[in-house]
Amino acid sequence: MKKLSLILTLTGALMTAPQAWSETLSATTQNPAYQVDNELILGRIENVYYNDIPELKGVPFMGKIDTGADTTSIHAENIHLTSTHPDFKDLTDNDLLWAVVNDRRENKLKRNTETYLSYQVTIAFTIRHPYTGEDINIKDDLERISIIRSRTSKKPILRPAVRMPLTIGGRTVEAMINLTKRSQFSSPILIGKTFLEDNAWVMAGYDYLQEQPHAQVIGKKETVEVNGVPYKVSVATTSRYSNAHAVDVKIDKEAQSVSFKLEDEKGERKAMTLPLIRILNTSNGERPLVYLPVKLNQNHTQHWLVYLRDRSHLSSQISLGRDVASEHFVIDTDSENLLKKADTSFKTALKSDPLVISPKETITIDQEFSIPAQPSFIVKTPLLRVKEFDLSKKSGKEQVSFTLENSQGEMKTVTKPVLRKLKVGKSVRPVVEGVFELGDKKRELEFAIDNLGKSDTKPFFVMGHSMAKSSVLLNTRTEDLLSPSPLFKAGHIEVVQVEDLAFPVKLDTGADVSSINAKNIKQYQKDGKDMVTFTYENDVGMKQEFTREVVDVMRITAKKGEKANVRPVVEMRVRLGELDKIIRVNLQDRGRFHYSMILGKNFLKYGAIVSSDKDYIITEKPDYEK
């Protein structure tokens, strides 16, 4: 195997615009690169712009960046096709597409732009403005037809394709784009190989990576205006979507609009109507998603994707979820109302050496105990919650004892001298001291001890505000900022070692969880545990049976005409170059695919920067693949 030790050379300062870098830095998941080899590095989600369409110039559309997708697709409506060619002028839409496909096959013509242009097909379609609901009419020439294999029918699906410029991270690429309906997906745009090739790499561990240099720092509480109505904002790190207070919500599905009333703290109401983006299914029923115009200050208005609900019983009118936070902000966990200040940029905040954390961390205490950690907007003194603790005295001095699992998986009793005690409500928390590994730094910090809550089962750590001398900033774009991994280039296809087997796999930034081909799946129980036996095999003759504990199940939403799919999830050891991890893998029959495994975000997040078009960057291509 080739050596995996890429030190990425960057141009510029960390938090300036990506195009303006001039310093040389080593890049990690904690301090990421935004470009490499004069190509962008994109997160798994990015803002995409139709800047050549005047009505949509400067309007961001959410795009999913997927190295597993050969083509780029956009959501389009009212798609109609006509032709001025004498042989096809009486046909339209899907009939016209099939006639072109069949004619090209019969005449053995090449599948290229010149061939498709010769059929003189014009495509008319609309893209809906997400803020106004206006249908933007577009006409273009058919330049390609994508043939998509259907999982529910023997007959493939045909999608017309046009060439359009799309802009991400300040770079515009004229890409071949499929027109389709993507209303069932959270992202109206899917960015695939036709955009990424020779233009961008993908870092699956981040969302909105290209937006990070422009992020604003906001407080844990803010006040904004929506259509002249003051709304208080709080932050919810556990929720993906933001939600906003609204009453008298009425959805007009035919007009694709939502009418509702804003309501301030005094109960005064103001009517508003916005385009319906889509319906979101929540635990409390269906909720309409809209782009809410949010005025941050006198000079700046943003549009936040929120679902509408009654929040009259809550102290804030907007709950800010991870998606909107990642697109625009970094949160100061201890401050409030920072939007009123002149300069709230992330770039400026970094100068004071804050502790930057993510919603999900693992910290190491005293070099032997790895504990899940989470941010807090309330706790000042860092807090370790344990199953139980005991106070005692030794030589007249008070000490506290508690049990943690060490790096060898052994339960070990820890005893520390009590420095002081904190009274919080009815509980009294002893305060002790420990050595913490925070990224590449070791710090001796005080922390409090308390019992787990009733619903908690395992010890965890709460990252209080006093963990840093300046401030603790929350960056929701990624995870594990305190356990950084070096960035490395990886091909779309690489040879990985899975347990004792080595074979080529596909690196797919669009997949949340990795997946492996599994036959003869048999689930059973043993000693109270859910177990599974399955056979791995691929099309070059490798075959091996595995037995694993089932650690989870994945429920795949069925398409029309399909049965719901439930896949057992197991843990397997996977190695790519120097990256060696035990990850969760779902079991599915991938027999119809050449590549018997895909590595998704849960492996790639450890520093992989993936190409969509280059293969075998780290590893050698096997002879049987040549």
Question: Whereabouts are the PLM-identified features?
Answer:
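Gram-negative bacterial Sec-dependent N-terminal signal peptides
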Residues: 1-21
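Pepsin/retropepsin-fold aspartyl endopeptidases
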Residues: 22-626
